[in-house]
Structure formats: structure tokens, C-alpha cells
Regions:
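A charged, aromatic-enriched C-terminal amphipathic alpha-helix characteristic of glycosyltransferases
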Residues: 214-264
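Conserved acidic donor-binding segment of nucleotide-sugar-dependent glycosyltransferases
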Residues: 194-203, 212-216
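Membrane-proximal helix-turn-helix segments that form the acceptor-binding/catalytic region
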Residues: 3-25
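Short beta-strand->alpha-helix junction loop in the catalytic core
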Residues: 31-32, 47-59, 112
Length: 266
């Protein structure tokens, strides 16, 4: 639904044709399920988050210790395209760093260089990097180097306009980051309200940062990768057992665990 949406005028009929043959559809969040229902999809739709294998991800950063002291760093890892709202990120970053002189802000990418389909954003980002030494752009990171960033930073920031769960939030919380995310799209389903800011509002975003920093509590966010790993296992369970009753791991975590334990115990 996400990337093919602009092609819906000719592709939707093809998708609905496949829908008639499918015994189930996996999506990350309830809002995605609702959008598919509105578009005419009739197959069972299971909300299973994204298929994160927590153990495999943790193995990529064997030095990670959740008890280690963390640095006063905000990490931003989303693409710099329009749907991620990067100009807003830059505005927030500049204001945040002005208010918090003991903090740094890292923008990361695994690419050899930063890319964007949004005109002007790369120039604006590098201009901010020149005038604000605590705003740092980091490119060509390996997965291990990225995970090392997450395991030492305190907060992952997001400004996306259309994410369905988001890999950034799952990987960040797996490695102990707290989060500041927009109260938008799929995020309110699983992120606590006190970590969500009013979309497009810089002042409210800064207040949310202040609250998250002051509380210093990421116990709620540690649940995200656990539930997502559970969702990955539920995908296998649903396929293996031809399970046609719709499941939502965000809402039925205990029931999903029960089904998996029941299967394991025979």
C-alpha cells in the first residue's frame, strides 16, 4: 500500500485479484489494515509489526551492554526524502542543540553519501553542519557501526509522515534508545503518549524532548522489539497452521505467546 499507492490507478485491480487467492496478509500496524479494508481487500489481515529477529540483530553488536553509560546524543536515521519530513528534522535539530549545549545530534546513513529526492534538503543539512559543530552527518556506516551508534545514544528522533511501525524505532529500542516520535499514522498504536509530539510543531517537539530527557525511562519502549520478534514467530505459526482468525500482536501479545507455547508443548 505504501510505495505502490501512486500506481493504484492501474495496480489496484491486480492487487485485489491476488487478494481473492490469498489466505492471509501480514501488515505492521492497525492503520495499514484499515487502509487495505477501505481499498476492498477481503482476505484475513494479521497485524504482526515488522519481522525483526531480535537475537540476530543483537549478535551484530556483541559489545552492547544495556547497563553502560549512554551519551547525550540524538540519532536520526530516516531517509531524507519528502515523506520523512527532513526539513522539519533540521528545524528541530537546530532549536534543540541551541537549547541543550551538552548534546549532539547525529544524522546517519549506510550509503556512501547522503541522497534525497527532495530539492534543497542536502544543502540545508550541510549548511547546518557547518554552522553547528554538534550537528554531525555520518555516512557509509556498516550495520554494526550503526548499531553501535544506537547502543550509545540516548534518543532516536523521527519526523516521518507515513511510516507503518518503522525499522528505525525497532532497532533503536532494541539497543536501549528512548524515542521522540510524531503523534501520527501508526505510531500512537504502540508508542506511549508522553514520547509523542504534535506533528509539525517544533515547540511541542522540544517540550517532548525535555520530558523524555527528564524522565530517563525507556522501560516502555523496550517492549517494541520483543513484540515485533513475537510477530515474526506468529507469521510462521499462521502459515504452518492455516490459521485464519485475525491476530494483532500489539493488542494480543499474551494470546500470541499462549498460541506459540501451546504449539511448542504439543
Amino acid at each position: 500500500y505504501d510505495f505502490v499507492y501512486p500506481m493504484r490507478s492501474w495496480m489496484r485491480g491486480f492487487e485485489l485479484g491476488l487478494d481473492k487467492r490469498m489466505t492471509g496478509i501480514f501488515v505492521g500496524s492497525t492503520i495499514h489494515k484499515e487502509q487495505l479494508r477501505q481499498a476492498g481487500f477481503e482476505a484475513p489481515i494479521h497485524v504482526v509489526s515488522l519481522p525483526l529477529h531480535a537475537e540476530m540483530a543483537l549478535d551484530k553488536n556483541p559489545k552492547y551492554n544495556p547497563l553502560d553509560q549512554r551519551q547525550n546524543t540524538v540519532v536520526y536515521s530516516s531517509r531524507l526524502d519528502k515523506e520523512k519530513n527532513p526539513f522539519f528534522m533540521l528545524e528541530v535539530a537546530e532549536a534543540f542543540l541551541a537549547d541543550n549545549p551538552n548534546w549532539t545530534w547525529h544524522v546517519t546513513t549506510s550509503g556512501k553519501e547522503f541522497k534525497s529526492s527532495l530539492p534543497g534538503v542536502l544543502g540545508a543539512m550541510h549548511e547546518l553542519e557547518k554552522r553547528q559543530p554538534r550537528f554531525v552527518c555520518m555516512h557509509n556506516l556498516t550495520k554494526q557501526e550503526y548499531y553501535e551508534q544506537l547502543s550509545t545514544a540516548r534518543i532516536q528522533f523521527n519526523s516521518a509522515l507515513q511510516d507503518y511501525v518503522s525499522w528505525t524505532v525497532l532497532e533503536a529500542t532494541l539497543f536501549g534508545c528512548d524515542v521522540v516520535y510524531p503523534n501520527f499514522r501508526s505510531f500512537p498504536e504502540f508508542i506511549p503518549q508522553d514520547k509523542l509530539y504534535q506533528p509539525f510543531d517544533v515547540n511541542d517537539c522540544l517540550k517532548t524532548f525535555d520530558h523524555v530527557i527528564e524522565r530517563g525511562n525507556n522501560f516502555q519502549t523496550m517492549r517494541f522489539p520483543i513484540v515485533s520478534d513475537l510477530g515474526r514467530q506468529m507469521e510462521g505459526y499462521i502459515i504452518a497452521n492455516d490459521y485464519d482468525k485475525e491476530i494483532n500482536v500489539w493488542h494480543e501479545e499474551a494470546y500470541c505467546k499462549h498460541l506459540l507455547e501451546q504449539e511448542q508443548n504439543g
